[in-house]
């Protein structure tokens, strides 16, 4: 018996436009987590002096950098139900395997060959959690498929977790239709997010998540679609308030992260982390609502960059790594609060964006030429 997933809901055009505009900005925010110059963990793991330098470092990597994954996961869950209605489960999985699993494989293997292998050959302390050099089949498998390890190309754990969400899509979509149970599941998932539980049901790959907040946000997206809600907030004052709430919560949490030592206040840090991620979703939804309802140069630029966002996600760690090596070789280590630090961050980001544009454009042109020749 075939389950009828059709709900008769079509997201408003504004929602699609807002998603398109916010996507590249979320990817850029995610890339903040891979700024090697920002050592926020040393500040969080031991009570540090509260000065602007320490606060800003933690604010960028402990706050803003975490805002990309939750909303991208929510958007994926929201659109997943529409795709399930259109294609059915098996065809959707094939499509998502091409979109998520195939890039997970090639981008990690390329990263291993170009970066991790030679780096470990020179220094075994580089990614000691992965046995790449000397060759280990298990180590390469873990580094490629995010098998109970952060993969070689670190941000690509998101692809593995997102594909797991699609594996669970029929279950999540069915539960979302059951009144009261759907809300109870939200509470259960939130609890697992706060206390960093990794398994959906069992500690078995691939149902083991690197970040459980990914499936939590994915499920919230499914619920919003089931409740026939758009993702654009119409009230400008509400949007401004939510953006302010996100910045305030991230800034306040950064103060606590700097002043207190995480090992001694682990539970407080876990709850603060969840609150920051929750506020980040609200703030980023509000921000994309403002961008799409009040179009200008920034929203126009983001809209133009949107087709290159996925390529930026896949390749930015390559560019960051090579750029950092070139910079330190030429100029030495950049100083975070000096001119060198500002130039380093800005130029590295611009280089990553330009590389994504060039690579995506070249690939599109090559595919078009091959198809024309066929």
What do these predicted regions represent?
Residues 1-10, 291-306, 317-374:
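C-terminal "closing" transmembrane helix and its immediate cytosolic amphipathic cap
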Residues 4-5, 229-303, 326:
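Alpha-helical transmembrane segments and terminal signal-anchor/GPI-anchor hydrophobic tails
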Residues 12-16, 85-94, 171-181, 226-239, ...:
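Membrane-interface helix-boundary motifs at transmembrane edges
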Residues 14-50, 64, 68-79, 98-119, ...:
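Kinked, hydrophobic transmembrane alpha-helices enriched for aromatic residues
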Residues 17, 56-69, 146-161, 197-219, ...:
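Interfacial loop-to-helix transition and helix-capping segments at the boundaries
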Residues 45-58, 131-135, 139:
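Perimembrane loop-to-helix junctions flanking transmembrane segments
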Residues 65-68, 72, 81-85, 100, ...:
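Hydrophobic alpha-helical segments with transmembrane-like composition
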Residues 69-81, 160-171, 193-234, 275-296, ...:
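Specific transmembrane alpha-helix
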